[in-house]
């Protein structure tokens, strides 16, 4: 994606965020009114990438360094890069190791045979190659894949509903 295309996209997204802020029902998510926090500093993002051995997808990186670093929406809010929640939920993640799932081989629990699913979780397979974008709470999370064995998967957004899988 060219830098001009990214800039145009970011401008459209920023305009839409302003419109969403004025239309959002303040009772629909915790924390009241929707707020977007300032963009993250480029050196801080570069340091995070170096620490974890990954390069963030260009469009996400541009958004968090030029539009908003985090916010109070959607759901429980857009997570700030590298900042754990109150339960220190990032301590188990390894964003630099490849995300093991693919579009044809997602992590799915088969109620008829749950063992492979639970074995994969025990091995930490669900904790590799991604960063959290936001959470609905109770184990329902939207994630961004930042490292993947399958190059087509890197940069895609997945929904983890580990609380309700089996």
Q: How would you describe each model-predicted region?
A:
Residues 1-137:
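A surface-exposed partner-binding patch
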Residues 130-132, 141-164:
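Low-complexity, glycine/alanine/valine/leucine- and proline-rich hydrophobic stretches
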């Amino acid at each position: 994606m060219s830098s001009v295309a990214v800039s145009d996209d970011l401008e459209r997204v920023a305009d839409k965020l302003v419109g969403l802020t004025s239309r959002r029902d303040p009772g629909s998510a915790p924390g009241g009114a929707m707020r977007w926090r300032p963009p993250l500093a480029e050196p801080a993002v570069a340091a995070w990438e170096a620490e974890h051995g990954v390069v963030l997808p260009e469009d996400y990186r541009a958004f968090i360094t030029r539009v908003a670093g985090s916010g109070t929406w959607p759901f429980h809010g857009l997570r700030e890069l590298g900042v754990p929640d109150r339960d220190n939920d990032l301590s188990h993640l390894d964003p630099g190791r490849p995300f093991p799932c693919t579009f044809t081989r997602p992590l799915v629990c088969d109620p008829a045979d749950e063992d492979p699913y639970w074995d994969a979780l025990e091995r930490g397979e669900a904790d590799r190659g991604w960063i959290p974008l936001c959470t609905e709470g109770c184990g329902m999370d939207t994630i961004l894949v930042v490292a993947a064995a399958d190059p087509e998967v890197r940069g895609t957004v997945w929904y983890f509903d580990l609380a309700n899988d089996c």
